Structures are given as C-alpha cells and as structure tokens.
Amino acid sequence: MDTTEKLKLINRNLKEVIGGDIMEKIINKRDLNVYWGTATTGKPHIAYFLPILKIKDFVDAGCNVTILLADIHAFLDNLKAPIEKIECRSQYYKKIITLMLKSIKVDVSKISFIFGSEYQKSNKYFTDILRILNQTKKNDARRAGSEVVKQVKNSKLSSLVYPAMQALDEEYLNVDVQFGGIDQRKIFMYAREFLPLLKYKKRIHLMNPMIPGLNSDKMSSSDIDSKIDLLDTKLEIYKKIHNCSLENEGLIFLFKSIIYPYCSIFNLQIMISGKVYTFDKLYEDIKMKIIDETELKNIASDMIERLICPIRDEMLRDLKLIENAYGNK
C-alpha cells in the first residue's frame, strides 16, 4: 500500500483532519503512531463501534495503534467512575474493546493497550501537569473540556485538570496522532496551543462524527433509551430499534456508520422487499417515505444482533467482572 492509499484509508469517513500535511510527510518515512483514548466510565455501547471501525482502518493502513484506557480521567470527570470501581471498569473496557476489535477482523496483536495510571502517577508527568497548568487560565480549561467533561454549575477542580492531562498524553504516549470524536475538538485545540509552551510538538488530530441517539441528539451511556448496550438481549435490541423514530436520523446514522461498514467487511448485503440497497438509495427512500419501515427496522435489529451477539455471549461468561464493574444494573 503506497502513501496515497494509506492516507485515503486513514482519512476515510472522518469529520475533520488537523495537520494532514504533516501526516503525509511522516507516512513517506515510516508508519504513523496513533492513539485513541477512552475514559473508563459507563458501559461501552453500539456507538463505540464508530471509533473501533476507524481503528481497523488505521491498522490496515499500517499504523501503530495505542488504546489508552483513561482510568484516572474517569475519576476526574465529576466522579463518573468511583475510585473503588476504576480498576474493574478498566478491565471491563479492555476485554470488551478487544472483543469488538476481533469481531470486525482486527489483528489485536497490532494494538497496544495502556492504562493512564501506568504513567500518569510518575514524578515527571506530575511536574509537567504543574507546568501546563501554570500556563492555563481557568476559562481555558473550562472551554477545552466543555464538550467532553460533565458540565455542572460549580465545577470541581479535578474536571479542569482533565484537558491538561489529555494534552500531555500525546507526549507521554510518544504518538504522532490523537484520534477522537468531533466532541474532542476543543481539547485537541488546547493541546495544539499549550504543548508547544512546554517545548513539546503539536500533534495531528483526526476526528470522527458523533452518532446521534436513537431518540436524542447524542448516544450516551447515561441515557438508556438513546443507546444499544453491547450486553442488550436480542429482544431489547428489537424493542429499542422499533421504538425509535426515523425523523431524528439516529437509525439512519447507525446504517451509515456501523451497519454498512460491517456488511462491507463480511461481504453482506442489505436487502429490503427483495431489493438490494446501497446506503445512498436507502437514505433516499427513507426520506421519500417509500420504504417499509417495519422491514427496515427488522433488518437493523438483525444486523446489530449479529454484530454484538458474540461479544455479549463472551462477556456474559464473566458475570463477576460485570458485577464488580457496574453492579447488577
């Protein structure tokens, strides 16, 4: 695969790329080092397949990929993860993300997992936290985290440290690229502004679109009705899909960003009323309201069940891990 082909795969379906000119120069010399971080808070849901599918593109393009399980970040974000649950939730995340990667034919031997607590407690990292915070005004930190960190009227100081740590992670993971959702953009711009003040280089930033919820603007772990949990039963998936409205495009986005890419990997087709549908034709017929909505939702339910069934079955073999991480909910 030449540089042009690699760049096409790396940039495919992204919402925004910052620093693409630098990326091409690096790829001409060596493999790109990319990291994606996720705070180990609520249970991963179907929308997590959006970054997982993108990680497959990175691996297929020859990138070295690191997945940061941001356990300390999870605690800092308004106590989304109680400190006594952090280790169990981090192990839960590692296991389920590994299963997700395997389910779409990613060679997990090409991916490195690291917990934030493995290096974020070091003296050097702590010194750099003090250095970057010494350059950061309160409003800088609040603005940077406004789309990611839970916003409350009287923010805890810990939530203001969150963006600074995420910026420093780029340096301490020794990467060229940080990848995340478009909701991370303000943190990425903070990193580009403040890392050079510590004599660290700016990184490249790649951003995915966000998946809307089934009946809301954003699919969220905290909103049960907006998401499909990766441990949901076949019946729960069916009910959630059939209760969602086509008006807010949550289901349409699932087809575009998860179901069709999954079908492409396994050479599957979407067939409705005896007709094979591309996504563009599907979207057109939905907008024109000439598609059988019940059959459409049946197909969506079946494909999502097919995708998550092996993941759910494997996770349910370790009920102790689930209980320790999230209780009985």
Swiss-Prot record:
Signal peptide: none annotated. GO terms for molecular function: ATP binding; tyrosine-tRNA ligase activity. Keywords: Aminoacyl-tRNA synthetase, ATP-binding, Cytoplasm, Ligase, Nucleotide-binding, Protein biosynthesis. It is found in: Cytoplasm. InterPro entries: aa-tRNA-synth_Ic, Rossmann-like_a/b/a_fold, Tyr-tRNA-ligase, Tyr-tRNA-ligase_arc/euk-type, Tyr-tRNA_synthase. Its main location: cytoplasm. It comes from the Eukaryota. A motif ('KMSKS' region) lies at residues 218-222. GO terms for biological process: tyrosyl-tRNA aminoacylation. It is an enzyme of class 6 (ligase). It catalyses: tRNA(Tyr) + L-tyrosine + ATP = L-tyrosyl-tRNA(Tyr) + AMP + diphosphate + H(+). L-tyrosine binds at Y35, Y162, Q166, D169, Q184. GO terms for cellular component: cytoplasm. Its EC number is 6.1.1.1. Coiled coil: none annotated. A motif ('HIGH' region) lies at residues 40-48. Belongs to the class-I aminoacyl-tRNA synthetase family. Homodimer. This is Probable tyrosine--tRNA ligase, cytoplasmic. It comes from Vairimorpha ceranae (strain BRL01) (Microsporidian parasite).
